[in-house]
Amino acid sequence: MAGVITASEPSWIAPFSGLSPRQFGKLVTVLRREGADAVRKGRPWSLPLEDRALLVAAYWRTNLTMRQLAPLFGVSKSAADRIIDHLGPMLALQPRKRFAKDTVLIVDGTLVPTRDHTIAERSKNYRYSTNHQVVIDADTRLVVVVGRPLAGNRNDCKAWEESGAKAAVGKTLTIADGGYPGTGLVIPHRRERGQAGLPDWKEEHNKSHKQVRARVEHVFARMKTWKILRDCRLKGDGVHHAMLGIARMHNLALTG
């Protein structure tokens, strides 16, 4: 069965991965170095590593069903499933272990509609969703940590710790919105009970805080051009692997 899409034709790479051919080539080189193309027991892969990586990226990018996606790469539905199960986790972003003293981070939670009801719950958007705590570097806009997914009805202030994001950043200065009270994060000033308004300096601080914090919303907007984050059909850890892999490709697209 001959496929239509292949990484050997550079014009297919950007539409189906969100990366330039050069960026995609760097990703494949790192995957090969990390053992993604190692000889394994059982039936050998019917596609080269480049095409397998493009298949996974295309699945996340387009959110086509396996029945739609597999023929485009000339493989069976079950083969496409196996490729995603094997390579998806290997594409995951590795959390940054150390931060410079002057680093400023921004955290926010984003909801991913998720059909696996064993890990998802109805959230404020009335859909079954998972809550993902995403931490970015305020200066570079790169994703540095993605917490483990929690049920979509989990408050951000609880999800911050329960997802592992808090432990991952340690004591690094981190900015958040007003949904993180009592967490020790830098959040906007609030009026106290009976207070008519905030002092001018607090209003000014909140204004600059909001402008900086908007950077994480821009990251979410870019990440959600990978359509699987709008309606994830994957089960179990699949949504986590997709979030981590997309974060890695987002970073690669920014840095080249």
Curated annotation (Swiss-Prot):
- Species of origin reads Streptomyces albus G
**UniProt keyword Ribosomal protein present:** no
Q: What is this protein called?
A: Putative transposase for insertion sequence element IS112
Residues spanning the membrane:
none
Q: Which GO terms describe its molecular function?
A: DNA binding; transposase activity
- Tell me any Pfam family this protein matches: DDE_Tnp_1
Family that this chain belongs to:
Belongs to the transposase 11 family.
User: Which GO biological process entries does UniProt record here?
Assistant: DNA transposition
Keyword Endoplasmic reticulum annotated: no
- UniProtKB keywords: DNA recombination, DNA-binding, Transposable element, Transposition
Q: What does this protein do?
A: Involved in the transposition of the insertion sequence IS112 which inactivates the SalI restriction-modification system.
What InterPro entries does the annotation carry? Transposase_11, Transposase_HTH_dom
